[in-house]
C-alpha cells in the first residue's frame, strides 16, 4: 500500500488543548464523585442500613443527582470532541493508505451497484488499530434517478470511546482517485449518553 497521509494525534491538537481538556474532565469527574459521596452520606444518615437509606432519598433527589451526573458526562464528551477531534481531507485511490494516530485507513477497492432508486459508487476501506483489523467501512456516492441529485453517504464505525467516519467527496483524475474525508471523534457518544441521563432526571 502507498502511504499518502500520516498524522499523530498529538500533532493534530492545539498546544493549549491538553491542559484545557484535562481540566474539564477533572471538573466533570469531581461533579460525579461529589454526588456519589453525597448519596452515600445521606443514605447512611437514616441509620437503617445503606440500601434502606437509598430507597428513602426520594424521587426529587434522585432526579437532581441524575441531571447533574448527566451534565458531567455530557461535558466530558463535549470536551473530548472539541479538543481531540481530528478531520483530514486526503486524495486517495485504491491501494492508498492514510493514518491518524494508531488508526490506519486503507482504500482497498471501488465497486458500482444499483439501488432501488439510485446508482452508487461504493468504496471499501479497511480500518485497523495498531495493526489489528477493526472494521471495513463502505462510504458511497449516490446519484438518485428521479432528481439526478448526488448524495454522499458517509460510513461510520460507532463505539463507546470514539467514532470513525469515512466519506467520499469528488472523483479526481477521471475517477482513479477520490477526495476522501476521514474523521476521528472521541467521546461523541458521551454527549448523547449525558443528555439521556439528564432527561431521566
Model-derived segments and their meaning:
Residues 7-201:
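Solvent-exposed, non-transmembrane regions of integral membrane proteins
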Residues 1-6:
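Short, exposed "boundary/linker" segments that immediately precede the start
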